[in-house]
């Protein structure tokens, strides 16, 4: 046990935290983790929080925060313009192709930080607000699919065609 504690104390932050998709070694394994082997709605659950919108990115962990990305629809769906002449796409059954593209609501592309101990939202920042130009999503797809990444000083969030955003961790209160 003393050897394990010593190894954790000597590990760098990059080794101790989950700063990228699939963790420090990109293997999905937390070498210094001690996760529960059993859980349910009431057992080994510290907190549970509802996240607005949809995001399929893997959360990352650094220090006392968990970071995640989400895309939140806001307002009413907007007609989608066609690529040629900027005209409104013809009405259709929704999935694109010759019948037209479905209308899509404005989305807020959000970076969130959640306190690891309490589950409270520490902060959230709207990276961008825009109507997505991709009208088609797979059933499990989202507009926030790429995982954030951090080097401990900066947090990087990639929202595909909506941009790459860099945040100063110190300025964000990390």
Question: What label would you give each PLM region?
Answer:
Residues 7-174:
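Noncatalytic, solvent-exposed loop/strand surfaces
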């Amino acid at each position: 046990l003393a050897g394990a504690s010593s190894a954790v104390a000597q590990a760098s932050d990059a080794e101790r935290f989950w700063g990228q998709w699939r963790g420090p070694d990109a293997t999905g394994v937390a070498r210094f983790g001690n996760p529960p082997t059993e859980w349910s709605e009431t057992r080994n659950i510290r907190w549970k929080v509802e996240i607005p919108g949809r995001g399929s990115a893997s959360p990352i962990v650094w220090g006392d925060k968990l970071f995640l990305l989400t895309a939140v629809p806001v307002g009413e769906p907007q007609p989608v313009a066609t690529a040629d002449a900027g005209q409104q796409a013809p009405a259709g059954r929704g999935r694109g192709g010759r019948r037209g593209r479905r209308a899509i609501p404005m989305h807020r592309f959000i970076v969130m930080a959640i306190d690891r101990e309490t589950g409270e939202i520490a902060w959230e920042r709207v990276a961008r607000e825009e109507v997505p130009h991709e009208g088609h999503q797979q059933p499990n797809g989202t507009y926030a699919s790429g995982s954030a990444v951090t080097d401990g000083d900066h947090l990087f969030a990639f929202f595909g065609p909506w941009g790459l955003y860099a945040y100063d961790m110190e300025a964000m209160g990390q």
